[in-house]
A protein has these predicted regions:
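Terminal amphipathic alpha-helical/low-complexity segments used for targeting or macromolecular assembly
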Residues: 1-173, 296-308
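Structural signal for interior beta-strand "rungs" in well-ordered beta-sheet cores
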Residues: 175-290, 294
């Protein structure tokens, strides 16, 4: 026996032994998990329904919108229903019950699509009103990562409220990887919501955000660290942000009892774990800057550019 074959056989034996001990590796009763690729394609294809003139490759979208939308929705409806059914089957539901469950949820989801579109239009308006660098709403739809992350969140949140396993989180983590913006599908977010720049924004599962809220890059709406883990699964762990609040870059607002009152501005680089009253401006004390005069060429003999 060659060394290569020996190593492979030993690895196979150890791996399969672990598979037998931990059902996690092979799934529950060998049931399929939802297809991640199908769900990502669903996200992409739904954009051609919400904004048909932008993401549709079919020219009929603008000429015969009724026919185009009916045709595309039929396919998307079947795709989502199938993936939801697979998710419930994996969770142990009986086949007929999972099928009926998926049918009802899919019906409610697509009945809610016009409302999702309405909410996104308010988010779009918030982005345009709040960013003087935006040349047009079209630019925001096409290119802003914050708007894309919000779009995916609004789809995923509807399924989260229906207690659909796996799919809402697959959606949100796809958006997270694509944009660098992490919005848990369980968060509750009002209309006219805007994330400017966006990289590094984190919004936790039990966060509540009111109307007309604006976040900048690096903002965390998170939980205080705890060792209780799963014991807090259904407990409010993340802050509440009231209407008309702006939170500037790299600020952290933490804790389930923390409430930021309406019409409040949170300055950058702040760390907040207690409630802030309405109509307030919060800022961190600026660090002292040390400014030195430039040295002459004769003096610059040190190897390093930085010197105390």
């Amino acid at each position: 026996m060659t060394e290569k074959k020996k190593i492979i056989l030993e690895a196979v034996e150890k791996l399969t032994d672990t598979y037998r001990k931990e059902e996690l590796f092979l799934g529950k009763d060998r049931e399929r998990l939802p297809n991640k690729k199908e769900i990502i394609n669903f996200i992409k294809d739904m954009r051609s329904i919400i904004f048909p003139g932008y993401f549709s490759v079919d020219s009929s979208a603008s000429v015969f919108p009724e026919h185009y939308v009916a045709y595309r929705l039929n396919d998307l409806y079947d795709c989502l229903q199938e993936q939801i059914e697979i998710a419930f089957l994996y969770q142990g539901e009986e086949e007929q019950k999972a099928k009926e469950h998926a049918e009802r949820i899919t019906e409610r989801f697509f009945a809610n699509v016009p409302e999702i579109q309405r909410m996104l239009l308010t988010d779009l308006q918030a982005g345009f009103d709040g960013d003087p660098a935006a040349k047009s709403k079209e630019e925001i739809i096409f290119s802003y990562p914050g708007f894309y992350a919000i779009y995916v969140y609004r789809l995923a949140h509807v399924l989260y409220l229906e207690n659909v396993p796996f799919i809402p989180r697959i959606m949100s983590e796809y958006a997270h990887g694509y944009t660098g913006i992490d919005i848990n599908p369980g968060a509750t977010i009002g209309e006219y919501f805007f994330i400017d720049h966006g990289t590094g924004v984190v919004i936790g599962e039990t966060t509540e955000i009111g109307r007309n809220v604006k976040l900048y890059q690096g903002v965390t709406l998170g939980a205080l660290s705890t060792r209780q883990g799963q014991l807090l699964a259904n407990v409010k762990r993340h802050p509440t942000i009231r209407d008309n609040v702006t939170i500037y870059s790299n600020s952290s607002v933490l804790g389930g009892e923390t409430v930021i009152g309406e019409n409040t501005i949170i300055g950058g680089n702040t760390f907040i774990t207690a409630s802030i009253p309405a109509n307030t401006k919060v800022s961190a004390k600026s660090p002292e800057l040390v400014i030195k005069k430039p040295r002459s060429a004769v003096e610059t003999t040190n190897v390093w550019d930085w010197e105390n």
